[in-house]
Curated annotation (Swiss-Prot):
Gene3D superfamilies on file: 2-enoyl-CoA Hydratase, Chain A, domain 1
GO terms (BP aspect): fatty acid biosynthetic process; malonyl-CoA biosynthetic process
Main location per the UniProt record: cytoplasm
Protein name: Acetyl-coenzyme A carboxylase carboxyl transferase subunit beta
EC number: 2.1.3.15
Location in or out of the cell: Cytoplasm
Pfam families, per the entry: Carboxyl_trans, Zn_ribbon_ACC
Known function: Component of the acetyl coenzyme A carboxylase (ACC) complex. Biotin carboxylase (BC) catalyzes the carboxylation of biotin on its carrier protein (BCCP) and then the CO(2) group is transferred by the transcarboxylase to acetyl-CoA to form malonyl-CoA.
Lineage per the UniProt record: Bacteria, Bacillati, Bacillota, Clostridia, Eubacteriales
Enzyme class: transferase
Family that this chain belongs to: Belongs to the AccD/PCCB family.
Catalyses which reaction(s): N(6)-carboxybiotinyl-L-lysyl-[protein] + acetyl-CoA = N(6)-biotinyl-L-lysyl-[protein] + malonyl-CoA
C4-type ZnF: 38-60
């Protein structure tokens, strides 16, 4: 009896080769990109439903970061957007090591020419000039080409007597271009001052994230400043500020809701309502003259 109790267990060994040859004929395959996990609530979302809902989680309302193509799709009347200045090429004025290669790699990966796309389109039949920043391109950092494209768009808006809408999404000035990137803050701000002198409307829509030199310049110069829900908006990072002033900062003090509460922005607009709100603001401005 004891001999049977402590006898060695026998196992069947299956080689890895045999496992690899085993085919699960009835196992369904799920194509890549069909399901997306919400990074806020953890819900697994069907990609097609998410796109129909403006890339917003239907459970918690989390606004996913979106790029230029999605913005154009959700904002403009169909087939009315015309891109400007897409041939302007990014240079390496400081001969920063690896910068040229990095730019080319990101261009191939994102199919974008730079961190901002500018152009003209129609919202509810009304023409507007728009600049859309995309955080997928070097975190939407502002270099000389970004500043040049936005400035040209504003100058063209003055010529055409059209309102300007800028969607911000940026980590700030591009370090690889040094002082030239910081110059773009003043350059764009100067162009916006001329737009203001002409009595033309400038609406800024702050999206997640809007930080650094972009926040310190044109992001906060709008006649009307809108923001998407729960967007990160600030200049320096929270930890940097806390270490500098040696004080604990309020929770979510760099979120759009906090900024609205303290009078830094005019309104928080869910993405699904943005086109309607912008159309109303543009129409009101046009009818005031």
């Amino acid at each position: 009896m004891l001999k049977n109790l402590f006898r060695k267990t026998k196992y069947i060994t299956v080689s890895q080769k045999n496992i690899g040859n085993y085919k699960r004929e009835n196992t369904p395959t799920i194509p890549d990109g069909m399901w997306v996990k919400c990074n806020k609530c953890g819900e697994i979302l069907y990609q097609n439903d998410l796109e129909k809902n403006y890339m917003v989680c239907n459970l918690c309302g989390n606004h996913f970061r979106i790029g230029v193509k999605e913005r154009i799709k959700y904002l403009f009347d169909k087939d009315t957007f015309k891109e400007w200045d897409y041939k302007i090429k990014t240079e390496n004025p400081l001969d920063f090591k690896g910068y040229d290669e990095k730019i080319e790699h990101i261009k191939e990966k994102t199919n974008l020419s730079e961190a901002v796309t500018t152009g003209k389109g129609k919202i509810a039949g009304m023409e507007v000039v728009v600049c859309i920043m995309d955080s997928k391109f070097m975190m939407g950092s502002m270099g000389s080409v970004v500043g040049e494209k936005i400035t040209r768009a504003i100058e063209r808006a003055i010529e055409l007597r059209l309102p300007v809408i800028i969607f911000t999404a940026s980590g700030g000035a591009r370090m690889q271009e040094g002082i030239l990137s910081l110059m773009q803050m003043a350059k764009v701000s100067s162009a916006l001052a001329k737009l203001d002198e002409e009595g033309l409307l400038y609406i800024c829509v702050l999206t997640d994230p809007t930080t650094g030199g972009v926040t310190a310049s044109f992001a906060m110069l709008g006649d009307i400043i809108l923001a998407e829900p729960d967007a990160l908006i600030g200049f320096a990072g929270k930890r940097v500020i806390e270490q500098t002033i040696n004080e604990k900062l309020p929770e979510d003090f760099q979120k759009s809701e906090f900024l609205l509460e303290h009078g830094f922005i005019d309104k928080i607009v869910p993405r699904s309502d943005l086109r309607k709100v912008l159309a109303k603001l543009i129409n009101m401005h046009q009818n005031s003259f």
